């Protein structure tokens, strides 16, 4: 039998240096090795128990090494952090908060390390990855209730409900909240690019280069 040995010492050291408070994080090198076994360099890596987002960290490192364009989806319940923990004292409230910040810092480090590596070589060789091509961006979505006002058809509440529908959307929701729900209802990926267009006093969202236009102005 083949035996693979990986330890998490470097991952633990990095997590402690960043005061994330994870005593036993998964080995970034081990996750990176598993991902490298997938033939496609353009796959989507899904981690349904993402914890501190080691999988996202490993994905970005591997892309920096072999020029892949892998993407990741991290899913994690917003578990509360212990009150007396170092991470709590640093301002993190949930495991998701730690994961988000780790992705930011890991992405910046992966890119800066790649720039430093290329500067030592002096010129960009054929198999080297251009730092400008390395995508370290990500979006954060939280599962919640619909942004649309719910219709209540009880007769004695009919008049008040009609007044509510002066706006189709809940008052405490942002335009981006509404936009992304509209994208989902139209079957559009949340990774599609969104740009803002000004037309007079109106703001229009262009989704996926003309695939969908959304204007949320009252008039």
What role is predicted for each listed range?
Residues 169-187, 191:
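Glycine- and aromatic-enriched alpha-helical transmembrane segments of multi-pass membrane proteins
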Residues 185-205:
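Conserved helicase/translocase motor-coupling segment
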Residues 53-57:
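Glycine-rich SAM-binding Motif I of class I
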Residues 205-219:
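Long, continuous compositionally biased terminal/linker segments
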Residues 33-43, 60-151:
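Cysteine-dependent PTP/DSP-like catalytic domain, specifically the C-terminal lobe
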Residues 151-165, 175:
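Polar, glycine-rich mid-to-C-terminal structural blocks
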Residues 49-51:
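Class I SAM-dependent methyltransferase "Motif I" SAM/SAH-binding loop
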Residues 1-44, 66, 77-82:
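Class I S-adenosyl-L-methionine
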């Amino acid at each position: 039998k083949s035996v693979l040995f990986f330890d998490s010492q470097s991952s633990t050291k990095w997590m402690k240096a960043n005061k994330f408070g994870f005593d036993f994080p998964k080995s970034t090198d081990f996750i990176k090795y598993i991902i490298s076994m997938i033939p496609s360099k353009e796959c989507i890596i899904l981690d349904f128990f993402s914890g501190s987002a080691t999988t996202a960290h490993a994905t970005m490192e591997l892309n920096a090494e072999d020029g892949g364009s892998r993407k990741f989806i991290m899913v994690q319940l917003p578990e509360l952090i212990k009150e007396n923990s170092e991470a709590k004292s640093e301002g993190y409230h949930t495991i998701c908060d730690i994961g988000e910040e780790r992705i930011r810092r890991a992405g910046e480090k992966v890119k800066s390390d790649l720039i430093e590596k290329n500067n030592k070589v002096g010129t960009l060789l054929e198999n080297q990855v251009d730092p400008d091509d390395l995508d370290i961006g990500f979006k954060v979505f939280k599962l919640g209730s619909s942004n649309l006002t719910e219709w209540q058809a009880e007769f004695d509440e009919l008049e008040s409900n009609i007044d509510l529908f002066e706006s189709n959307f809940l008052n405490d929701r942002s335009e981006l909240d509404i936009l992304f729900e509209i994208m989902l209802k139209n079957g559009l990926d949340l990774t599609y690019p969104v740009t803002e267009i000004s037309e007079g006093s109106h703001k229009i969202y262009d989704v996926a280069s003309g695939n969908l236009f959304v204007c949320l102005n009252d008039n």
